[in-house]
UniProtKB/Swiss-Prot annotation:
Gene: menC
Name this protein carries in UniProt: o-succinylbenzoate synthase
Cofactor: a divalent metal cation
EC code: 4.2.1.113
Xref: PANTHER family: O-SUCCINYLBENZOATE SYNTHASE, O-SUCCINYLBENZOATE SYNTHASE-RELATED
Family as reported in the entry's similarity comment: Belongs to the mandelate racemase/muconate lactonizing enzyme family. MenC type 1 subfamily.
Active site per database record: 107, 209
Pathway participation: Quinol/quinone metabolism; 1,4-dihydroxy-2-naphthoate biosynthesis; 1,4-dihydroxy-2-naphthoate from chorismate: step 4/7; Quinol/quinone metabolism; menaquinone biosynthesis
Length: 334
């Protein structure tokens, strides 16, 4: 079912979720939620994203609100803790929000910080969690990444380096130089050809996110063409977007790694009761936002109008596609 623009706007709720610490350069996360006939969907493309890229996120939100979820193969998903680029002294406080979690992803290569800061943070995490992976968000050159790999493994192993460099060619070059597995994120979700990183033998692990890839159906189609392990991660989603990620993870034939779906713990408040990991797992199931929370977290009128205008622009870029759950695709996906 494809909603009209008028119907979509009538079902829209725009909220601002305050964060416990600065993450990805922001302290408040704005998202638009869609109260659809099949459930709730989320449109949360980051504010700086241009309409064509953001339109994939709108497709994902429409699919969740109007489509049918895939059949699941598991009813709970192992998750990793996410540690922002905080000081080493703040690490115990962050990890305390992820009870039972045995894997942590640590942000590194933060602008304004240095490798020594990263080493201190990673070692502080290593004292409390069994398995550590790091995410540079493409912040290093090949040479800097190679040096970081040595420094970050001096006191213990890393599960993998996530997006250490920005380009597929750089990832491939680094992979030839280091023994640590390389994971690709931005090289998949922001690429015109999300499979190029696999064909180039540039990664050992694929980090896939539902919203940037255009929804669960598109996510699963891409995952089916990737012959390396998949890690499902969030895009700093609200509990609504996290739910879509859990459903996608539950539908994968294999799930070898803990997933980055615990980022809800980074928010001070969310639109529904926060999901708490139990023994390092989150349950798979639907979510319904609390009306009181929707109202309390609602944005001022000017911000709501900004999101309405954004939905209008992105919606105008979508084209019908009978093969997708949402019934829509971005123009470049045709």
């Amino acid at each position: 079912m494809i909603p009209t623009l008028t119907e979509l706007l009538d079902r829209l709720h725009v909220v601002a979720l305050p964060m416990r610490v600065r993450f990805r350069g922001i302290t408040t996360r704005e998202v638009a939620l869609i109260d659809g006939p099949a459930g709730w969907g989320e449109f949360g493309a980051f504010l700086e994203y241009q309409p064509l890229e953001a339109s994939a996120w709108l497709v994902a939100g429409i699919e969740a609100a109007y489509g049918e979820p895939p059949e699941g193969r598991r009813d709970r998903i192992p998750i990793n803790a996410t540690v922002p680029a905080v000081s080493a002294t703040q690490v115990p406080e962050v990890l305390a929000r992820f009870p039972g979690v045995r894997t942590a992803k640590v942000k590194v290569a933060e602008p304004g910080q240095n490798l020594a800061d990263d080493v201190d943070r990673v070692n502080a995490v290593r004292e409390l969690v069994e398995t550590v992976r790091v995410d540079a968000n493409g912040g290093w050159s090949v040479e800097a990444a190679a040096q970081a790999a040595v420094a970050l493994t001096a006191d213990g192993p890393l599960e993998y380096l996530e997006q250490p460099c920005a380009t597929v060619a750089e990832l491939a070059a680094l992979r030839r130089r280091v023994d640590i597995p390389i994971a690709a994120d931005e090289s998949i979700r922001k690429a015109d050809d999300p499979l190029a990183v696999v064909r180039s033998h540039a990664a050992d692990v694929a980090v896939l996110k539902v919203a940037p890839l255009g929804g669960i159906a598109s996510f699963l189609a891409i995952a089916a063409q990737i012959d390396i392990p998949v890690v499902v991660s969030s895009a700093l989603d609200s509990v609504v977007g996290i739910t879509a990620g859990l459903i996608a993870a539950a539908a994968l034939p294999e799930l070898d790694y803990a997933c980055g779906l615990g980022t809800g713990r980074l928010f001070v408040a969310d639109v529904a009761e926060p999901m708490l990991p139990v023994d390092g797992f989150l349950p798979v199931g639907p979510v319904t936002p609390d009306p009181a929370r929707l109202q309390a977290l609602g944005t001022p009128p000017a911000r709501r109008q900004w999101w309405i205008d954004r939905v209008k622009t992105c919606y105008s870029l979508l084209v019908p596609c009978a093969g997708d759950q949402s019934g829509l695709r971005r123009p470049r996906d045709r």
